[in-house]
Amino acid sequence: MADAGARRPFFRRRKTCPFTGSNAPKIDFKDSKLLMRYVSERGKIVPSRITAVSALKQRELARAIKRARFLGLLPYVIR
């Protein structure tokens, strides 16, 4: 009989990119509600290792956030 205290090792599920797939949202600088999910509470762009966004989509996302900031749709700094 196996150890009573032995447990199965925990395997973290690999996150998938939220922007890939058939019904994934498009990255658009006018969609400030979507972009705010990828900006921290201090106004910084959240890295892809935390959000699990692919490298290509992270570049698109950063470009869209910067464009929205320039046009005044998103704040540069949140106090």
UniProtKB/Swiss-Prot annotation:
Keyword Transmembrane in record = no
Looking at the UniProt entry, the stretches that span the membrane are: none
The protein's UniProt keywords, in alphabetical order, are: Ribonucleoprotein, Ribosomal protein, RNA-binding, rRNA-binding
The cysteines covalently paired via disulfide bonds are none
- Give the PROSITE patterns listed for this entry: RIBOSOMAL_S18
The entry's cellular-component GO terms read: cytosolic small ribosomal subunit
**Molecular function, one GO term:** structural constituent of ribosome
* Biological process annotations from GO: translation
Does this UniProt record's set of keywords contain Ribosomal protein?
yes
Question: A Pfam family name for this chain?
Answer: Ribosomal_S18
What InterPro entries does this protein map onto?
Answer: Ribosomal_bS18 (IPR001648), Ribosomal_bS18_CS (IPR018275), Ribosomal_bS18_sf (IPR036870)
Assembly state and interactors?
Part of the 30S ribosomal subunit. Forms a tight heterodimer with protein bS6.
Q: What family classification does the UniProt entry report for this protein?
A: Belongs to the bacterial ribosomal protein bS18 family.
Q: What does this protein do?
A: Binds as a heterodimer with protein bS6 to the central domain of the 16S rRNA, where it helps stabilize the platform of the 30S subunit.
> Which protein are we looking at?
Small ribosomal subunit protein bS18
Q: Which organism is it from?
A: Afipia carboxidovorans (strain ATCC 49405 / DSM 1227 / KCTC 32145 / OM5)
**Taxonomic path:** Bacteria, Pseudomonadati, Pseudomonadota, Alphaproteobacteria, Hyphomicrobiales
